[in-house]
Amino acid sequence: MSEIKDIVVQGLWKNNSALVQLLGLCPLLAVTSTATNALGLGLATTLVLTLTNLTVSALRRWTPAEIRIPIYVMIIASVVSAVQMLINAYAFGLYQSLGIFIPLIVTNCIVVGRAEAFAAKKGPWLSALDGFSIGMGATGAMFVLGSLREILGNGTLFDGADSLLGSWAKVLRVEIFHTDSPFLLAMLPPGAFIGLGLMLAVKYLIDEKMKKRRAVTAPSAVPAGETGKV
C-alpha cells in the first residue's frame, strides 16, 4: 500500500511532469489557451501514458535491451493513433482545436521517459498506475493554467466544453466578467510562460511551507544512551 501511495503522490505532486520535471512544455504552453483544450489534451495524454506503460511492462521480458527505444516508440505511436481516431470520432470539435498536438504526443518526453524509467522495470498494474498518476498530474497543471489564461483573457470558463463532453456541456460555460476586447497577453504564448512561472512559484512556496511544518512537528531525536539518566 505504501508503494501505491508513493507512486500516486510522486505523479500528482512531488514529481509532477509539468511543474517539477518541466517536460512536455510545447503542448503545455501552446494548447492551454482554454480550460477545455487543456483538459482534452491532458486526458488524451493520460490515456496514452496508462496504456503505454501497461503494454511496455507486459512485454518487458521479451523486449531486447538493444532495440528497446524503437520498440517503445512503436508502441507509443500505435496507442496515440488509436486515441487520435477516438477523439476524431467522438469529439471532432476538440480534435480540430488540438490539431497537430495530438499526434505530437508520440514525441512527448514524459511518455518515453516513464516507459524507460518505470514500466520497463515494474509489473503491469503498478506501471499502469504510474502512467495514470503522471498523466493526471500533467492534466491538473494544464487545466489550472488553461483556466487561468481563459479567465484572464476572455472572462469565461469552460467555453467550448461541448466540444469535449457533448452538447449537454454547454451549460458548464461560465462568464466570470464581460469583456469586449480580450486580454491578448494571457491568450498568447508569453502569457502561458508567465502563468507557468506563477504556478512554479506557488508550488515552491507550498513545498517550503510543508517542509517547515514537518520540521516543527517532527519529534526531537533522543541521543543513544541518554534514556533513563537522571
Curated annotation (Swiss-Prot):
Keywords: Cell inner membrane, Cell membrane, Electron transport, Membrane, Translocase, Transmembrane, Transmembrane helix, Transport. One of its GO terms (cellular component) is plasma membrane. The chain crosses the membrane at residues 18-38, 39-59, 63-83, 86-106, 125-145, 182-202. It is an enzyme of class 7 (translocase). Belongs to the NqrDE/RnfAE family. It is found in: Cell inner membrane. Its EC number is 7.-.-.-. The keyword Transmembrane helix applies. PANTHER family: ELECTRON TRANSPORT COMPLEX PROTEIN RNFE, ION-TRANSLOCATING OXIDOREDUCTASE COMPLEX SUBUNIT E. This is Ion-translocating oxidoreductase complex subunit E. It comes from Salmonella arizonae (strain ATCC BAA-731 / CDC346-86 / RSK2980). Part of a membrane-bound complex that couples electron transfer with translocation of ions across the membrane. Required to maintain the reduced state of SoxR. It is a multi-pass membrane protein.
